[in-house]
Amino acid sequence: MTQTQFQVVILATDKASGNSKLEPIDATIPHSLLPIANRPLISYQLEFLEKAGFETKSEPVIIVVNETSQEKIKQYVSEIYKGKIEVEFFVLKDQLATCEILYRIRDKIRLEYFMVLNANLVLEDTFIRQMADLHRKEESSLTVLLKPPTPKVEQKGKGATETSTKQDKLFTDYIALEEKSQKIVMMEPATEVEEDLNFNKSLLKYFPNVTIYTNLQDTQLYIFSRWVLDLIIEDQKEKYPLFFDIKKHLIPYLLSCQIPNIKRKRALPASAFNQNQTLSQTMSSTTSPFDQFSELNAQKNKTIKCFAHLLKKEGYCMNVNTIKNYQQINRDIAKGDLQYLPNEPKSEKNFFIDPTANVTITQVGPQCVIGTSTTLGAKCSVKFSIIGKHCKIGDGVRIENSIIMDHVIIEDRCVINSSIICNDVYIKSGSSTVGQYLTK
């Protein structure tokens, strides 16, 4: 099914990409270009948009980048990416919050619905189609993609438990859903709750069957109806805007709009109740979309609806926002049983080796990826690992459960285990690297 009514915005500015705990591996590489099974992260996003049927010839995908990363990302899209998705870049010269970014690109968002996703998300295209169908069918103002909990992977090494606990809280939300309709009525980040969670009792009057979850993850993929952009535009014109961050400010406001006659700090635009109007109709009007809000709001407030789309547990979705998740998605794709695959050809023994690599198949175990022009020395052993492009691995090196990026040199008799070795790193002979993240 072609998604002609939806325009996509990818926030690839690193800092605008939500919470991220990938230091130090993203210190010298733009977040959206981090290699996953030897493919840049953004390539997976462009692939799932294409598979989901997004038509981008008239309205391209908008990728928001900052000045420091724009050249590398533009180079990948223009010179290496071979897919059908059309892309338009918007370069930020200063650091802005997510609502401010949407205000800056307001003239580029021209369709009835717009989808905002962070540059760290990889998921199956089926979920996007289902989410888009839900948004249209229910005439939703906001649709949020939520992910059920995944089995925890044991972390090893000093400080693993403490770090994991802090990160679990960082990515935990208190989410209230009306069970029958799957309307989302509250979403509060755990980091914003100091002691007790405040729950608006008026919600129970209109949503009596509500369940509060602490184990659903906000994937930071949102679909908005076009009127929400009108709301942001008018808010940003105020001396003291209310909306800066999509998750912290805009979404709680939209959720509260589902309660009739609630007192609001910002009025809703008239376009909120005529969601099928085109942008040309809105732009050609000589009146503000807020001019007729007072009586209209009182009568039609109930038409504001916000929904959650819950992913099925058997489907694949990963936010690449922690090192643990980064390692996991590399392992997942190297297995070769997802809809996403490395660019290297797959062998009968379930590994992926580029034809230009100087490797003997007895050196490489299953679920490994070996990149372009990489050389393995005599008696090397590679198990459950990713090795990037133009790497030189010496004799007798053992690599297991690790990610080796591009242009890495590892001398003879080294042991690399459960580590990430970033671009251009040089490792001396006889070194042992276990559970480390090495950068140049």
Swiss-Prot record:
Presence of keyword Cytoplasm: yes
Location relative to the cell: Cytoplasm, Cytosol
Gene3D superfamilies in UniProt: Hexapeptide repeat proteins, Spore Coat Polysaccharide Biosynthesis Protein SpsA, Chain A
Recorded GO MF terms: guanyl-nucleotide exchange factor activity; translation initiation factor activity
Any Pfam family matching the protein: LbH_EIF2B
Quaternary state and interactors: Component of the translation initiation factor 2B (eIF2B) complex which is a heterodecamer of two sets of five different subunits: alpha, beta, gamma, delta and epsilon. Subunits alpha, beta and delta comprise a regulatory subcomplex and subunits epsilon and gamma comprise a catalytic subcomplex. Within the complex, the hexameric regulatory complex resides at the center, with the two heterodimeric catalytic subcomplexes bound on opposite sides.
Family: Belongs to the eIF-2B gamma/epsilon subunits family.
Function according to Swiss-Prot or TrEMBL: Acts as a component of the translation initiation factor 2B (eIF2B) complex, which catalyzes the exchange of GDP for GTP on the eukaryotic initiation factor 2 (eIF2) complex gamma subunit. Its guanine nucleotide exchange factor activity is repressed when bound to eIF2 complex phosphorylated on the alpha subunit, thereby limiting the amount of methionyl-initiator methionine tRNA available to the ribosome and consequently global translation is repressed.
PANTHER family found in the cross-reference section: TRANSLATION INITIATION FACTOR EIF-2B SUBUNIT GAMMA
UniProt name for this protein: Translation initiation factor eIF2B subunit gamma
Gene designation: eif2b3
